[in-house]
UniProtKB/Swiss-Prot annotation:
One Pfam family it belongs to: DMRL_synthase
E.C. number(s) listed in UniProt: 2.5.1.78
Top-level division of the source organism's lineage: Bacteria
GO biological process: riboflavin biosynthetic process
Keywords: Riboflavin biosynthesis, Transferase
Catalytic-site annotation from UniProt: H89 (proton donor)
NCBIfam families: lumazine-synth, PRK00061.1-4
Enzymatic reactions: (2S)-2-hydroxy-3-oxobutyl phosphate + 5-amino-6-(D-ribitylamino)uracil = 6,7-dimethyl-8-(1-D-ribityl)lumazine + phosphate + 2 H2O + H(+)
Protein source organism: Geobacter sulfurreducens (strain ATCC 51573 / DSM 12127 / PCA)
Protein's recorded name: 6,7-dimethyl-8-ribityllumazine synthase
Binding site for (2S)-2-hydroxy-3-oxobutyl phosphate: S86, T87, R128
Pathway the protein contributes to: Cofactor biosynthesis; riboflavin biosynthesis; riboflavin from 2-hydroxy-3-oxobutyl phosphate and 5-amino-6-(D-ribitylamino)uracil: step 1/2
Amino acid sequence: MPRFIEGKLDATGLRFGIIVSRFNSFIGERLLEGALDALVRHGGDDGDIDVVRVPGAFEIPLTAQKLVQKGNYDAVICLGAVIRGSTPHFDYVAAEVSKGIAHVSLATGVPVVFGVLTTDTIEQAIERAGTKAGNKGFDAAVTAIETARLYRELR
């Protein structure tokens, strides 16, 4: 009979770093509210959560690396919104942010969760920041909790 290993959705005693981009802050702040709600709702303590604000999404990966190096975080949650405009800038930023976040997680073994919206329109971003499509900040925090617990089980 196989043994199944999975993380529990319990943030009690876990420490989290949250990085949120100030660019498109009206979206980022809704994502942050969702993430904080999820962490506290699942047993997290406000005193175990550090929120770091960065200018834009491009600064998120290096900041995540700095947080992980600082230590004592069970997971880092990355939040922001990159919205397509009329130039290729979106493609460069979205690609590098997603690659950078994945790299930090793989290089450090600490869950660094991608909660950065990459949308074609502002309407799509609004839908994913607490309206029709739920709150992706909440979802990212749930992923962080479960993954942090899973990694503790795998030690």
